[in-house]
């Protein structure tokens, strides 16, 4: 007896179906003959890849508003995995950078959604090493049109989502938080399932929230076994001065997690439902979302995590409400003439700078979560991207 799986859209608009035979040995699969051999080669390429997660904190808006917005969005669109052909630059023998890959994906998706800006905002994850693919949120009609675009090998519904009502992603899923935050922090069996994990300080100086969420996901993967489960289990993170995260796992997994290198302690989340978490251990409870931004006075801010499509005009509009601005400067690459993804914002007063630092850190601009920090010196304008230093924890490759 065969169990049918959802159809896959292959480049050119061809729809094929995939089925798994329940009569065969465990793990064996039978694939419809309509699926070409050239498409099967994609599977092996999915093993080693770098990801570009676009992350947003679930605590930045009132839960009721977020839940309503999430429901409305899901009624119009779903998440799709789009596998692309090798970009022209890579085909010529040279490597493809993150910027080039995002441009390639956005240009393709723009043919369906109408503009590159809209396309970039709909892309929620991208891979550009070993395999070229991205995930985007569009409706079914748009997915069919996308499958016909040049360079598109396949468009498939993202089966990592548990259901249409629980659209988990690489972000800290709002739907996940709403579904588990309606009361107790224990299961029906009486056992705790919500844990606060304190972590060691990372070994690099400059760390962004996106990098830390990726790090925490890899740590949790060692216990849960796969990335998707780890992603949707994390519901809170601390990433500036105190490091750690909160996750929804059973007690046995919590005991195993305590033995993972880099983990300082695993204890019940006694303050579930609040952003005030005790990641400092015995040093007191504090809000991790406000870490490093309280009572800091500075005129000059350093902004990272910018979309390549964010203009100085857009950035100025986002920061102007906090006070009079002296300068808004996005750093551009001298060769490509495109944004490097970071900028400097300077105010006339320290009070305005401090207020912007506290309020804007972790906000979303053009679909990307920005990270705001104190600008150390003006010489950082001339750095060649050292502030974007990637944090790559040591973990066993899958």
From Swiss-Prot:
GO cellular component: a single term: chloroplast
GO terms assigned for molecular function: RNA binding
Region annotated Disordered, chain positions: 54-79
Disruption phenotype: Pale-green leaf phenotype.
UniProt record, GO biological process: chloroplast mRNA modification; cytidine to uridine editing; mitochondrial mRNA modification; mRNA processing
Biased composition (Low complexity): 54-70
Transit peptide boundaries: 1-88
UniProt entry keywords in alphabetical sequence: Chloroplast, mRNA processing, Plastid, RNA-binding, Transit peptide
RRM domain residues: 299-377
Compartment(s) where it occurs, according to its Swiss-Prot or TrEMBL record: Plastid, Chloroplast
Role played: Involved in C-to-U editing of chloroplastic RNA. Functions as major chloroplastic editing factor. Controls a majority of the chloroplastic editing sites.
UniProt-recorded name of the protein: Organelle RRM domain-containing protein 1, chloroplastic
Lineage: Eukaryota, Viridiplantae, Streptophyta, Embryophyta, Tracheophyta
